[in-house]
A protein has these predicted regions:
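Charge-rich, low-complexity N-terminal segments
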Residues: 2-183
């Protein structure tokens, strides 16, 4: 009998073999500028962003509920898109050290802007969503965001992914969304 014939096939649901995750795609529109950028991204401009958020169960993605899901897709949409709509959609993302942009945006009435603890690059936006937003809005659903992809264009994206235990995350400086409805 050959060695191949004596090997046992792994069980269909062996957690050492199968890891389950789900990805929810979200879309929003926002403007930004990149502080100290050497080219045209230093100007105020906007994008139709797409965000892909991948989540696994807190158990590592090896278990599902009685329906067979990690979590219902609609819960990811409700929580994450709700946050995006409230904070970033149709607003400007401004780096907290960009005094010129902050002064300019405050002159426009009404206005909506979100102050970030770092330059609002696609990389930093993905990082912020992964490290700050997802743990706060998804934490009680029994899932952990493992990866966030922020698409600025159909051809260009940035990826932030967890490489360690989610409990090791440190929260960056507090950020704030500011909406001024005065006319």
């Amino acid at each position: 009998m050959s060695a191949a014939a004596t090997r046992e096939e792994p069980a269909m649901h062996d957690p050492a073999i199968t890891q389950l995750s789900l990805v929810r795609q979200l879309k929003f529109c926002a403007g930004h500028r990149l502080y100290r950028h050497e080219s045209k991204c230093a100007f105020f401009h906007g994008h139709n962003y797409r965000v892909d958020i991948e989540v696994v169960g807190v158990n590592g993605g090896t278990e599902v509920d009685s329906v067979g899901r990690i979590v219902d897709f609609s819960m990811i949409k409700k929580r994450m898109l709700g946050w995006l709509d409230d904070n970033w959609d149709h607003g400007f993302l401004i780096y907290e050290e960009d005094d010129n942009a902050l002064a300019a945006i405050k002159m426009v009435q009404p206005t909506k802007y979100f102050v970030m603890p770092y330059n609002p690059t696609a990389e930093n936006m993905a990082r912020y969503l992964l490290e700050v937003v997802a743990p706060n809005v998804l934490g009680d659903l029994g899932v952990v965001a493992r990866k966030v992809v922020v698409w600025e264009t159909d051809e260009s994206c940035a990826v932030a992914a967890l490489v360690g235990d989610a409990s090791d995350l440190t929260t960056p400086l507090e950020s704030a969304v500011l909406i001024d409805h005065r006319m």
